[in-house]
Amino acid sequence: MQLAKVLGTVVSTSKTPNLTGVKLLLVQFLDTKGQPLERYEVAGDVVGAGLNEWVLVARGSAARKERGNGDRPLDAMVVGIIDTVNVASGSLYNKRDDGR
């Protein structure tokens, strides 16, 4: 899994039928210091994540296993909303504080 921040939603009115009803989010991956990387992904969302929230993103076959998504063409899935991230040097992220 990887840490990412939700940048927004992706709306697609014309898509493969097995993606109907799947909420899509634009996420930006974060490094080990919580800084944004220049890597983005469109990910399915099964947890109801919102704008600017830090999330856990599963990729590849792990993403497709979540909630029976095996037949959906999903390479990435938001599988968790992060409350806190703590490292040896202290708190990296706290949702209550809305950032660092």
Curated annotation (Swiss-Prot):
Biological process annotations from GO: carbon fixation; photosynthesis
Gene Ontology CC annotation, any one: carboxysome
Localization per Swiss-Prot or TrEMBL: Carboxysome
Protein's UniProt keywords contain RNA-binding: no
Swiss-Prot/TrEMBL keywords: Bacterial microcompartment, Carbon dioxide fixation, Carboxysome, Photosynthesis
Molecular functions (GO terms): structural constituent of carboxysome shell
Hydrolase among keywords: no
BMV domain sequence ranges: 1-83
Function according to Swiss-Prot or TrEMBL: Probably forms vertices in the carboxysome, a polyhedral inclusion where RuBisCO (ribulose bisphosphate carboxylase, rbcL-rbcS) is sequestered. Has been modeled to induce curvature upon insertion into an otherwise flat hexagonal molecular layer of CcmK subunits.
Family: Belongs to the CcmL/EutN family. CcmL subfamily.
Assembly with partners or alone: Homopentamer. Interacts with full-length CcmM.
HAMAP family: CcmL (MF_00858)
Protein's name in the database: Carboxysome shell vertex protein CcmL
Source species of the chain: Synechocystis sp. (strain ATCC 27184 / PCC 6803 / Kazusa)
